[in-house]
């Protein structure tokens, strides 16, 4: 199984894909935590929950690491931004995001002893078969694509009829996980 993570200091999305099929997705809202340390503690708790769901034997026996019938074998994380994007990101924002990306990457490695792989958002969308037409917002295109093609993917709307913010992060995590699955398939074919 593949765990895909779309890391952000506001809302982080998670998705698990098995054999190319979405089996789990969720997010954690970190906006209520005011510093990177509190955000890290919340992330660790969320990753532990996922670890317990997919790495442990949940039949009540006190089995150890990796005893799940279908454990997570690979972790894919969206690569953090490395450049300014036309007034969208300040140096401070990029620095904080990169730092948090590194912390969460380490937490994932520490908890499940799997070295995360990093994939850029554009590359992930390409691997997942999503094309973003020029001039359109990638997050909106991804959301619409998944709503059309992924029966397990459901979103909630605000009272104004807009997708709730976590919908976009969950969708991005699904794309990262599906891209990770496709990349692993490509690696197996080459071997």
Features from the language model and the residues they span:
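Phosphate- and other anionic-substrate recognition elements at nucleic-acid/protein interfaces
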Residues: 1-191
